[in-house]
Amino acid sequence: MNGGPSGFNNAPVTKAFVIATALFTVFFGIRGGSSKLGLSYQDIFEKFRIWKLIISAFAFSSTTQLLSGLYLLYFFRVFERQIGSNKYSVFIFFSGFVSLILETILLSLTKDPTANLLTSGPYALVFASFVPFFLDIPVTKRFGVLGVHFSDKSFIYLAGVQLLLSSWKRSIFTGICGIIAGSLYRLNIFGIRKAKFPEFMASLFSRFSLPSLSSHSQPPRRTSPNLGRQAVRAYRAPMPSTTEPSEEAIATLVSMGFDQNAARQALVHARNDVNAATNILLEAHSH
């Protein structure tokens, strides 16, 4: 398992979000106000500080949270490559909106105007992303340390646990809200997984994209030596496609942790349809 090609190739929305998170965190950290960015009952129900609602969705309250959060946001760019920048923008908006509603309900139940009950930072996006990470990203390597079994996904989970517990109850509450938001997106409530923003809005992020990286600079990933053959047996197209899979499609599947050769074979049988090829590989991996 890996995050795919290094950098933000084919992930301009993630790049914009990471930059905004870093800038807001550093700016308010220098001014000494980062610890006061967490939402409270007073912020929403008494003074209605709109600016704080926005800033709290980006700025972390500590350097430790920033490092863990940026690491996870950077890794989760794999999902933008998988579903496209437009739908990923919808995922970000939906996760943030649902999390804000849940946090507002939580604050309304406490009614404590003096305490910042919720910590600040993009917890909604980070922990909503753990839902597809848990369900869709396959384990490609297992190993043991002192009798304890780990996988290549364990480091991501450990970073998530560290971030979840970084401010104790304040961060646990926001993290749980993010997981619930990600679960609702996964359940396709209101058909949200098919929703898209107008193209002119999504294209605003294109200016943040980095120069594309050559796909053949990526070393082959190994999952299982028989995964490619399993993928072919798992799906038989009536008319084998003679179209060579695009390098971009192969890179997308490789970025999800699949072996390069298996990805190529799956794309051939799926007629270069990334979603269908993903299903083929996941089905083969489950056998």
Swiss-Prot record:
Parts of the chain that traverse the membrane = 10-30, 53-73, 90-110, 117-137, 145-165, 172-192
Q: Where in the cell is it found?
A: Membrane
| A GO term from the CC aspect | phagophore
Annotated ranges, domain UBA: 244-284
Cite the Gene3D superfamilies for this sequence.
DNA helicase RuvA subunit, C-terminal domain (1.10.8.10), Rhomboid-like (1.20.1540.10)
**How would you describe this protein's topology in the membrane?**
Multi-pass membrane protein
For this UniProt record, give its keywords in alphabetical order, as a comma-separated list: Membrane, Transmembrane, Transmembrane helix
UniProt GO MF annotations: serine-type endopeptidase activity
Q: Which PANTHER family match?
A: RHOMBOID-RELATED PROTEIN, UBIQUITIN-ASSOCIATED DOMAIN-CONTAINING PROTEIN 2
What is the stated purpose of this protein?
A: Probable rhomboid-type serine protease that catalyzes intramembrane proteolysis.
Q: What is this protein called?
A: Rhomboid-like protein 18
Q: Which gene encodes it?
A: RBL18
